[in-house]
């Protein structure tokens, strides 16, 4: 059989609207969080339910803008919310380790984008904490 005559199957791309909706919490309501939530709302059935910030005012503004039900003035309050399934960490990368460990300790799933942590050692700490949870 000639390998050039093989027909490859059409790739299947999952429909993002078919994914089960998760209840998201945003930790750090800044520009990158705005981009993520805008994309989630436009392309999926995911729900933003809570926002945590060091500033109650910023949390409330972000929550109002994107329809979140709750706004918290601390990250601890956000991760303690039983109605949040997954935390999007949108703080400066120098804070990612502490934020990730806080969320993992509360039993939450995480999404952390680049830079994941400041270095490989911190990344291993997050991996190890998640593995132990």
In which residue ranges do the predicted regions lie?
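N-terminal Rossmann-like dinucleotide-binding module
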Residues: 2-66
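Short hydrophobic alpha-helical segments of the AMP-binding
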Residues: 40, 103, 130
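Conserved hydrophobic residues forming the short capping helix/wall of the S-adenosyl-L-methionine
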Residues: 63, 127-130
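Glycine-centered short loops/turns at secondary-structure junctions
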Residues: 107, 132-133
């Amino acid at each position: 059989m000639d390998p050039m005559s093989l027909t490859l199957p059409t790739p299947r791309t999952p429909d993002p609207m078919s994914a089960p909706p998760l209840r998201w919490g945003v930790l750090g309501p800044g520009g990158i969080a705005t981009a993520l939530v805008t994309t989630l709302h436009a392309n999926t059935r995911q729900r933003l339910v809570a926002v945590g910030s060091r500033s109650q005012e910023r949390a409330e503004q972000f929550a109002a803008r994107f329809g979140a039900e709750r706004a918290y003035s601390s990250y601890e309050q956000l991760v303690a919310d039983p109605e949040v399934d997954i935390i999007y960490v949108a703080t400066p990368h120098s804070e990612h380790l502490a934020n990730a460990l806080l969320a993992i300790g509360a039993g939450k799933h995480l999404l952390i984008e680049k830079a994941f942590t400041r270095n490989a050692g911190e990344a291993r700490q997050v991996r190890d904490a998640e593995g132990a949870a």
